[in-house]
Structures are given as structure tokens and as C-alpha cells.
């Protein structure tokens, strides 16, 4: 038996909803005719319903990651819909499992050099009792389960430890305990729950414009100086061509492409670089404006500063799909589940 879970809502039948953007001020009406998709983060109910009807496998649309774990836990243990503490424990157990190997030493910042057998990294396992739960892993897999690795996973994506909002429960981990109780075994306690929010997270994807990204690498000596000068050359060429970009972002991979304004750009850091990659990203609502930069990049291997190489293939114009993160009233979303018998 195959369980199918989906949800429906009408974005145009808004009844006064304003869909405020989490990230910046904006008017939802401005993107209404540019929308490609809408995904509501639903909770565990539809999945649990399929399990109750005998589903062997459940396929769902967008759901909160931790809901995939809460549903079978609630179904098996028979937790009540308002048993907020147990629901919160189930959510946090799922939270520690949902990223796979990340919960067992992958992406581990504290002591990544000493994670055993990362080439054979296993996934974490949650074992729940009445009031606590433990995280472990299969003994024949690589990785590590320790207090620090679980703390990193426990806190990721959590803005307010006293109010971690999910579709199923408002989780309070502000007094949670994480204790090493054995080799590759950690016990979690003190997780509490409060009534779930009245809204659900809604992610709206919409057309925003166009972009192109070009890169040129430069070798020692004076790698950064040459890359910087090449950026000036490109900008002068674009001015002559009358390019009207809405945004141009110039960065130097190996220097500031990740750290931006806090990167070390001192003379000492720059003078002996073995190599430096110039990255120029252009954004415009007009596709033709983005295209103007493309034919100017490749010739700069020979028509620009010395020691340049062009890589990654010829740049191309790509559509930009932007995200409008917001919320929608819970009662506006209809969750449906069906059972399909497959032979």
C-alpha cells in the first residue's frame, strides 16, 4: 500500500492576508503574476493518517523534515494530538536525524579532523523511551555521536531555543540536556512543548529576473592585483556597451567570495597569493542586458592582464527564481491523504 499526502490552498482567495516577507519589506501584489510555485510546510497529520490506513510507504509533498519522523512515532506510541511534550520530543528526535550523516559527524565544526572513518560515515539512530531519548549509530559505520556533535545539530536552524516553531508543536529546548552516556551514545532530556502555531510557513517561488556569472583565474605573481585590474577593464567595456544592470557583484574566490566585508584584504594577505579567481555576477530584469558581458570575458585571456585563464565554459544567461518566505493561516490549507494499492 502506497500513501500519498498533498495539500491545497488558493493563493488568490486571500481574504485579507498580506503575506509579509520574512526577509524584507515588499508588497505581495507585486509578484502575484510572476509566481511559479507555492509550497506550504505541512506537519505530520497526513503521514500519520496514511500509516493508520496501512500504508507501507508514504510519499508527501513539502512537509517539515522533522514531521517525517514524528508521524511514525506518534502513530506507534499513540500520543494524543495535544501531548505537547511528547510531540516536542518526537520533533527534536527527528531534528537530530533529518540531515542524515550531519548528525553523526558530517559537517562537524568542533573537531572534524578526528571524526573516525568519515569515508564510511553512518546515519544517526534515535531510541525513544517514555521521557528521554538517545542518539546512537550502527557500530560498523564511521562517524561520531558525542555531546558536541549533537549540540551542533540540535541548534541548527533554531532562532529562539524557547520557541522553535514547527507545524506540529512549538518546541522549548532552552532547558534541554545533552549527556554522553556511552561510546557513540548521547541522551537528550528536558525537551518541552507548547501548542502549535496558528500559521504555517509558505515558500513562494517567483520570477525575479536574469543573471550571468563569469570567472577568470590569475596566477602568481600579483594574482590579486591582476584580477582586480581585469575587473576594471570589464567594467569599462560594459560602460561603452551601455549595459544597464540592476546589480553587479564582484568578488575574488580565495579571498572574499565567502567572507565579503570581513575578509582579510591586508597587503600581507594579498601579496603572495599563488592564484586568485575573479568572479563577476550580473543581475538584470532585462535578459538582453545580462548577455552583453558574455562575449567580453573569453578574449581577456590574451587581451587583458597576464597569467589569466578562462574556465568553466562560456557563461550563459540564467533565469533567477526568487523566494518569498511568509506564513499562511493554518485553516486555509487543506491536507489530503490517499491510499493507493500497488501490485
Task: Show the residue positions of the predicted features.
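Gly/Ser/Thr-rich loops at beta-strand to alpha-helix junctions
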Residues: 1, 62-68, 285-287
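Single conserved hydrophobic/aromatic residue that forms the stacking wall/gate
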Residues: 1-6, 11
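Gly-rich Lys/Arg/Thr-decorated short loops/hinges at beta-loop-alpha junctions or inter-strand turns
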Residues: 14-33
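A glycine- and small-aliphatic-rich helix-loop capping segment at beta-alpha/alpha-beta transitions
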Residues: 15-17, 72-83
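Structural signal for hydrophobic packing residues in well-ordered secondary-structure cores
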Residues: 51, 55, 96-104, 128-133, ...
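A conserved active-site cap/scaffold subdomain adjacent to cofactor or substrate pockets
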Residues: 87-195, 211, 215
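C-terminal non-catalytic interaction/assembly regions of soluble proteins
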Residues: 189-343
Amino acid at each position: 500500500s502506497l500513501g500519498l499526502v498533498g495539500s491545497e490552498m488558493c493563493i488568490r482567495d486571500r481574504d485579507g492576508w498580506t503575506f509579509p516577507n520574512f526577509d524584507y519589506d515588499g508588497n505581495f501584489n507585486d509578484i502575484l503574476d510572476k509566481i511559479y510555485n507555492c509550497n506550504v510546510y505541512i506537519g505530520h497529520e497526513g503521514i500519520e493518517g496514511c500509516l493508520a490506513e496501512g500504508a507501507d510507504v508514504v510519499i508527501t509533498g513539502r512537509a517539515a523534515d522533522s514531521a517525517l519522523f514524528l508521524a511514525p512515532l506518534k502513530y506507534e506510541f499513540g500520543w494524543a494530538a495535544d501531548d505537547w511534550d511528547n510531540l516536542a520530543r518526537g520533533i527534536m528526535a527527528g531534528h537530530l536525524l533529518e540531515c542524515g550523516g550531519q548528525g553523526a559527524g558530517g559537517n562537524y565544526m568542533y573537531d572534524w579532523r578526528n571524526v573516525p572513518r568519515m569515508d564510511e560515515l553512518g546515519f544517526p539512530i534515535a531510541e525513544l523511551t517514555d521521557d528521554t531519548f538517545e542518539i546512537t549509530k550502527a557500530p560498523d559505520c564511521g562517524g561520531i555521536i558525542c555531546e558536541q556533535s549533537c549540540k551542533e545539530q540540535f541548534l541548527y536552524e533554531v532562532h529562539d531555543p524557547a520557541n522553535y516553531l514547527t507545524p506540529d508543536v512549538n518546541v522549548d529546548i532552552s532547558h534541554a540536556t545533552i549527556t554522553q552516556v556511552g561510546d557513540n551514545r548521547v541522551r537528550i532530556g528536558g525537551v518541552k512543548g507548547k501548542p502549535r502555531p496558528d500559521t504555517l510557513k509558505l515558500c513562494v517561488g517567483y520570477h525575479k529576473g536574469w543573471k550571468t556569472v563569469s570567472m577568470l583565474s590569475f596566477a602568481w605573481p600579483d594574482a590579486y592585483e591582476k584580477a582586480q585590474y581585469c575587473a576594471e577593464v570589464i567594467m569599462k567595456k560594459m560602460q561603452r556597451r551601455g549595459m544597464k544592470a540592476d546589480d553587479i557583484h564582484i568578488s575574488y574566490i580565495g579571498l572574499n567570495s565567502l567572507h565579503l566585508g570581513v575578509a582579510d584584504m591586508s597587503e600581507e594577505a594579498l601579496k603572495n597569493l599563488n592564484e586568485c579567481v575573479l568572479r563577476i555576477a550580473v543581475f538584470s530584469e532585462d535578459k538582453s542586458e545580462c548577455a552583453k558581458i558574455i562575449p567580453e570575458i573569453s578574449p581577456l585571456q590574451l587581451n587583458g592582464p597576464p597569467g589569466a585563464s578562462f574556465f568553466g565554459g562560456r557563461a550563459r544567461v540564467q533565469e533567477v527564481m526568487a523566494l518569498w518566505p511568509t506564513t499562511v493561516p493554518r485553516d486555509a490549507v487543506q491536507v489530503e491523504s490517499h491510499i493507493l494499492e500497488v501490485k
